[in-house]
Amino acid sequence: MTLYKGGLSRAECSAMRGVAILGIVLHNYSHWLKMAVKENEYTFIQSNADGIWNAITNVSWYLPIHLLSFFGHYGVPVFLFLSAYGLTLKYEAPQESAWEFIRKHFAKLFMMMIYGFALFLMVDRIVDGPHKYHMMDIVGQLGLFNNLLPDPDHVIWPGPYWFFGLMMQLYIVYRLLLYRRHWGITVGLMAVCFLLQCFCDPQGDALNRLRYNFVGGMLPFAMGLLYARYERGLKQWQYALLAVVSLLLIVGWSMEYQAWFWVPAAVCVFAVAMVKITPKRINDILVWVGGISSAMFVCHPITRKIFITISRHGDIYTGLLMYIVA
């Protein structure tokens, strides 16, 4: 079996995690504000796309909020890309049973999730506007299968914790279908997942359910796997060109339904290119942030619940700054 070396250093991977977690954390705060342009994450709403274009072309004091609200969730595809990248480098040479692999990664996700979930349940009851849980909602979160339950928009709480169920599904798909398999299997699964989505109603429940589960995350995950196997490296000017082109594609593809499915691919290309060309001083900061990304992800729904009321009462950037500091 080939030992893949990959094209990203540990520091570059950590810097990408830093960028991704900042996007996710700031998005999850910003999109709770009524004035913010809402994202197209699980479904595609044309008015949201039109709204961000209007915000970009008519710059206001709140443009950063609009950009974070609309684009920040694309930190998730970067994490999926890096997860597959790391799995390929770490596990494709050693032999390990499918059951042992799945058991170990379930335990890893559960231990990362449970402390934040337990604390959030307490904070949620204390702070105004507590969520009404049903028993199956909690069981689904503890079992990391709540993405599969009906109406995931209202079942999964805190909302960002849908990522744990998504990652568990992708771990299973990787080990059972993609582990040490021909690249054609990976590309074929990407194509199947795309076709399952592209014929759906842009605002329909079917698309919403698919994108809460591994079907919606397959593109960046598969890209990470293939990149780990076949990346050969580029020159600095080529990475710079890729960064510019991919950034333009992120914005352009976000405006049209069928093109929107490919935005995560452009986001992953942009993230890789940026860490390759970003000055070391900035990358060092991102590496540090990436090192605490797991803690930030687990804790940020709790701090959001506490500080969001400040921004909702008019002090938008004051609340956001307190949220960042906390």
Language model: regions and residue ranges:
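Membrane-cytosol interface segments of multi-pass membrane proteins
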Residues: 1-193, 313-326
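Interfacial loop-to-helix transition and helix-capping segments at the boundaries
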Residues: 11, 63-76, 152-166, 200-223, ...
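Aromatic-anchored segments of alpha-helical transmembrane domains
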Residues: 22-29, 142-148, 190-203, 242-256, ...
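Hydrophobic transmembrane alpha-helices
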Residues: 81, 85-92, 170-178, 220-232, ...
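Short, aromatic-rich membrane-interface segments at the entry and exit
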Residues: 133, 182-188, 209-215, 235-241, ...
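Hydrophobic alpha-helical segments of polytopic membrane proteins
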Residues: 179-192, 226-249
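Alpha-helical transmembrane segments of multi-pass integral membrane proteins
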Residues: 246-326
